[in-house]
């Protein structure tokens, strides 16, 4: 018996004995199989129906063995020219060969594909064709698989469940990514550094840090972004879109992450606890910043002056001291600011808005930070401690200023003279000595002041307000500094000692005046050449030149240049009354 292969097409192979064919890869019909066995028995010299059962089985087995031999031989006929892999069928070889070449090319962009189906899907990018519409909403999709995934948004179906924690997902890819949380698997490694990622998209985004690639451009301002999600968020600045609304207070946000953080104000949730102390935070970024208080880490260094910071945002703000950049202008006046928060706070001067009320008293504040600071008056909390002397403070800024007493640091130099200051606010106040600027004007008498605190004190002259009361004698004062000085009358405290003699003073200004006796310094000089050690003496002397007599007598109208002269004069009227 001789069985041979014959071919009718590239993809269909037949076994043949010259008369009957059996198609390989498909079940043979009963007629074909009977005919094939019949042919074998005819060649052996007897008819099929006369062959005993055992003999027929033997013939069939022999036929099967020869078939297997022929098929093994046939498998060796489909070899890949590129890599020497062998295939049983030509279709397998054809599919394999497409791993070496891509025969289906897009006429629009030249991109090539291994499969015609992949080309069809790709061409829909150019044509915009989306033949799979959702029956629930107006969305359409270019692939049926995308439609199936989308429909789970409407049905809520989550057929892919995690065996570890029971969490369910609408897509198998999401489950696979989630499972890497449990396994710790990070199969996508950066070729530039040692970082690995659980998602391919995470690695692609990370690679743009190294390459600097920003493929997503805003068509309003031409700003570029490394991630499409960042572009979408940015575009909401132009459109004003705020699609994420708080269901408690109705406040809307341009980003879902901002809404999540906002909702924690209502819930009080602080899911990020510090392992070093008992503080918790509503944001992970706040916890990371807070930890640096414990570790002392300051990873952000200024390239201009070498100063280091524990937050990148603080470094950016600091660098604007060097550059002078003030990118936030006020649309109500000519002022500009280096920080957005400073602009927002400033604009409340124009609007009068005070959105932060104290729950303990009736006070309201234009800044949240001012409310937090104020609230510590009620609680007595002083969370910031000096590691040099143990003194505690209710505000971190006060601790920083205090620490400069120990370090002697004065980081704010005046560019008009040689003076330096430990506080930026002190430098600003000092610079007004050089510029003569007096930006704070009284709305009752139009008098102007270089400092807001001086205006506040002055306005109490008009209002008669004396908010600072002495606990010993109930005397009231307009200024807290006056109350402190007054307290020393009761306590006898004289904290300012002269280094040249044993005298002490209750006021620093009195010590400075006294020290001029020892040094001979007379800093107040008149145009006539005469000099004085005290400002008050200089003022009195100038009245000789100006003729000013600001102290009039209420009885006779006579005026005097000195108050003491008026007091002496008034005694004349008092004596006259006694004589009468």
Swiss-Prot record:
Gene Ontology molecular function, alphabetical: DNA binding; zinc ion binding
Zinc finger (C2H2-type): 78-100, 104-126, 132-154, 160-182, 188-210, 216-238, 244-266, 272-294, 300-322, 328-350, 356-378, 384-406, 412-434, 440-462, 468-490, 496-518, 524-545, 551-573
Function: May act to control gene activity during the pachytene stage of meiotic prophase. May function as a transcription activator.
Family of this protein: Belongs to the krueppel C2H2-type zinc-finger protein family.
An annotated GO BP: inflammatory response to antigenic stimulus
UniProt name for this protein: Zinc finger protein 271
Subcellular location: Nucleus
């Amino acid at each position: 018996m001789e069985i041979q292969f014959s071919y009718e097409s590239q993809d269909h192979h037949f076994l043949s004995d010259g008369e009957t064919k059996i198609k390989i890869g498909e079940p043979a019909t009963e007629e074909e199989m009977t005919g094939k066995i019949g042919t074998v028995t005819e060649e052996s010299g007897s008819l099929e129906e006369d062959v005993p059962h055992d003999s027929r089985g033997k013939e069939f087995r022999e036929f099967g063995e020869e078939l297997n031999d022929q098929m093994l031989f046939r498998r060796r006929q489909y070899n890949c020219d590129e890599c020497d892999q062998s295939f049983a069928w030509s279709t397998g070889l054809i599919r394999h060969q497409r791993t070496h070449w891509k025969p289906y090319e897009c006429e629009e962009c030249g991109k090539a594909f291994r499969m015609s189906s992949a080309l069809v899907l790709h061409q829909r990018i150019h044509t915009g064709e989306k033949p799979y519409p959702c029956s629930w909403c107006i969305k359409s999709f270019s692939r049926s698989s995308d439609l199936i995934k989308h429909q789970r948004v409407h049905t809520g179906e989550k057929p892919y469940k995690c065996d570890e924690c029971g969490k369910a997902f609408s897509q198998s890819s999401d489950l696979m990514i989630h499972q890497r949380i449990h396994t710790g698997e990070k199969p996508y490694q950066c070729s530039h550094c040692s970082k690995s990622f659980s998602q391919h998209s995470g690695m692609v985004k990370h690679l743009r840090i190294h390459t600097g690639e920003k493929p997503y451009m805003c068509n309003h301002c031409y700003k570029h972004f490394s991630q499409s999600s960042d572009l979408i968020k940015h575009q909401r600045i132009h459109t004003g879109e705020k699609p994420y609304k708080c269901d408690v207070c109705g406040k809307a946000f341009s980003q879902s992450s901002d809404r999540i953080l906002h909702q924690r104000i209502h819930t009080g949730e602080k899911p990020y606890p510090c392992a070093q102390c008992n503080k918790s935070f509503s944001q992970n970024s706040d916890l990371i910043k807070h930890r640096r208080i414990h570790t002392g880490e300051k990873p952000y260094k200024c390239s201009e002056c070498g100063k280091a910071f524990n937050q990148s945002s603080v470094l950016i703000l600091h660098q604007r001291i060097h550059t002078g950049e003030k990118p936030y202008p006020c649309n109500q006046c000519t002022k500009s600011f280096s920080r957005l928060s400073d602009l927002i706070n400033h604009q409340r001067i124009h609007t009068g808005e005070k959105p932060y009320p104290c729950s303990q008293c009736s006070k309201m504040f234009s800044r949240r930070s001012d409310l937090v600071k104020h609230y510590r008056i009620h609680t007595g909390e002083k969370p910031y401690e000096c590691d040099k002397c143990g003194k505690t403070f209710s505000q971190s800024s006060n601790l920083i200023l205090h620490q400069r007493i120990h370090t002697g640091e004065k980081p704010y130099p005046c560019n008009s003279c040689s003076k330096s200051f430990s506080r930026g606010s002190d430098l600003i106040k000092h610079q007004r000595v050089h510029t003569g600027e007096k930006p704070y004007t009284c709305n009752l008498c139009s008098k102007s002041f270089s400092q807001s605190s001086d205006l506040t004190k002055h306005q109490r002259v008009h209002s008669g307000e004396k908010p600072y009361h002495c606990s010993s004698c109930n005397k009231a004062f307009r200024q807290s500094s006056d109350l402190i000085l007054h307290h020393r009358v009761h306590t006898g405290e004289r904290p300012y000692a002269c280094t040249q003699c044993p005298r002490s003073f209750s006021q620093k200004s009195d010590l400075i005046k006294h020290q001029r006796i020892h040094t001979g310094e007379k800093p107040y000089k008149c145009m006539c050449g005469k000099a004085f050690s005290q400002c008050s003496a200089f003022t009195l002397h100038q009245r000789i030149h100006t003729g000013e007599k600001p102290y009039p007598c209420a009885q006779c109208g006579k005026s005097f240049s000195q108050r003491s002269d008026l007091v002496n004069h008034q005694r004349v009227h008092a004596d006259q009354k006694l004589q009468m």
